[in-house]
From Swiss-Prot:
Low complexity compositional bias, start-end: 692-710
Organism: Neosartorya fischeri (strain ATCC 1020 / DSM 3700 / CBS 544.65 / FGSC A1164 / JCM 1740 / NRRL 181 / WB 181)
SUBUNIT field: Interacts with creA, creC and qutD.
Protein name: Probable ubiquitin carboxyl-terminal hydrolase creB
Active site (UniProt): C64 (nucleophile), H419 (proton acceptor)
Principal EC category: hydrolase
Amino acid sequence: MGSFLRSFRHNGGSTAPSVGAVPAKKEPQPPPMTPLEKRLLDMGPIREDGSDKFYGMENYGNTCYCNSILQCLYYSVPFREAVINYPTRTPIESLEAALAKSLRYPNPNAQLEAEAQAEKQKAANAQRPGMPPNPQQKPEDKDSPEYKKKMALQTLPLLETQNNAASYGMSESLFTSLKDIFESVVGSQSRIGIIRPQQFLEVLRRDHEMFRTAMHQDAHEFLNLLLNEVVANVEAEASKQPLMEKSLPAPETADSVDQSSSTGSKTPNTTRWVHELFEGLLTSETQCLTCEKVSQRDEVFLDLSVDLEQHSSVTSCLRKFSAEEMLCERNKFHCDNCGGLQEAEKRMKIKRLPRILALHLKRFKYTEDLQRLQKLFHRVVYPYHLRLFNTTDDAEDPDRLYELYAVVVHIGGGPYHGHYVAIIKTEDRGWLLFDDEMVEPVDKNYVKNFFGDKPGLACAYVLFYQETTLEAVLKEQEQENMDSNLAATDANDTILKQNGFPQSPLAHVHSASQIPSHEDNLRPNGLRRAPTAPQLSTHHEHGDPESTPFSPLSPLSPVPPVPPIPERVATVATPPKNDALAKREEKERKAAEKEKEKAEKLRRKEQGARMKENQRREEAELKAALEMSKASKAEEDRRLSTENGKEKQGGGLSRLKRGSKSLSHRLGKDKETRSVSSDLPPVPIPEHSTLSQSGPTSEQQQQQRQQSPPNHDQPPNSPQPGKPTIREDEQVNHKDSKHERTGHGKWRSFSLRKKSFSILS
């Protein structure tokens, strides 16, 4: 058993590789293509103007402010052409010689060698007995910007700029360093790469002390300094030339023609191209409120700095920039006409518009509480196209239209730290993101992510607008629509099989018709309505199979013969809907349903309000009726209780008294009428009439009330049921007849009184 184990160990050990064996070398594999390289696959030959070059810039420690501004200036076509052509272009021989020294192509096996070196070091550390094992390192995120920048430095060509000012007859300055960068990119034979602006940074730190430290700098301050430095260097170089040479006209060479056409210079003085591109003219209008005199003062600007407000736009910020300002109290205006300090109104207007408008959004504001600058994360919307309105009446070209071509974005929580990137619109390759060494294509809507309201710390800081025309804008929009439609058609026309090979949808159409069976021939066909208008619903092939109408009378019709397909299909009759169109229709449908629900909810709310109002009105009417009924009932009860109380107190004697009083009253009236009608014959009065006039007794009235309950619904003055209604004129006539019957002799009253006593007894 032991020998078997020894032999097994011996055989197993022999299969292990020896320590000194050299592993086989891996074949070098090219790195995967970047999104930018895929975007540039269909590019034609390299252009001479450098518009098809897309280079990143190496960061030398907090130099992202410089890289982002230089990228924006390079892709400003008139500025780039003016820099390259002033004073003249560098000769091709000297430029090629400089590029041969400065342009270095990386080793394609550098990445594999670096990985092999790392594996070798790891294996050597593992074999050492005293060395602790290396902790497990997290794999690098290949989608992170840091990894992409590292790979770009290892795989892309590196372009180191050098001082080449002597070749075009100028002394070294910040302008010549900028010119060397632009010419190196234009003259290189590679479309992509990385620039090392070390020589430019050395000149910048040599001439300006504030940039000598490795601290975070402001991109807007650097832009203003660079433009002013370029103007100063160009004018200083122009002043060194002899006056005679300056006065002579320059020969019209091809370069000068290209320069005049690209820069659009209106004056022969070539040193004014910076002013013509970036410089504008502001007019400060101040009106004294005492004498109403208006004084004007002109100021030049290379960029406009506007204050920000929450939930605003660039247009509203410019409107606030030109709003009227009251000068009062400590800020009073010294009026020359009045000869003293007076209250006045002041506002700023643009008198001359620049060709390239640089808008600085004041994201950093000094706060008294913190005693330092603080970043404002206000939402400020900036448009793709802009037209300025705050111009004077005599402004030059006041209706100039601008288009956005570059955005400098600040990423960070404050002005003393953070990162700058640039998003630039190229001539024919769309929008690109320039993040130091990394250059990536982005969508047009990506520019809208930096209004200031998105999660994160990225906000637009400097906006670059360049002049354009309405025809160019319409042409660009038409081209964008054509590209989107073409992309949607290509995406829908290509259907992938399960194995991944593309297949045209026409291949699924059967080319032969099936022979109908005998049962199908005997089955009756249903009547079908011939459509006179195109159907709005989707085709059954692309729609929901459950939504396809099915008729029990219609047979399972075989596939009809397909007509021959022409060689070239001009147009698609009914193109299938793409995802974007379906999403838009779904969004519109949901919006319509939402509006319908809102209208239905509003209708139900109004109907409920009307029902509540009707119910409230009915309740008020019912309550008023009940109150009226209660009042009438209370009045009836009060009247009945009063009558009952008097009858209980007086009994029959009270009626006798009332009757005696009425009879005596009548007797007095008879005496008065006796003298008037003494000649009338006496009328005998029967005994029963006297009893009927006296009315029923109290016992009879009480019995009648018990038998017939009171009617509360009738008003107090309404006639009681069972009692005859007597009109007023009839009552008067009846009383007169009574007086006539009882008006002869006193014996009638005595006989009535006697009979009343007999009834009581």
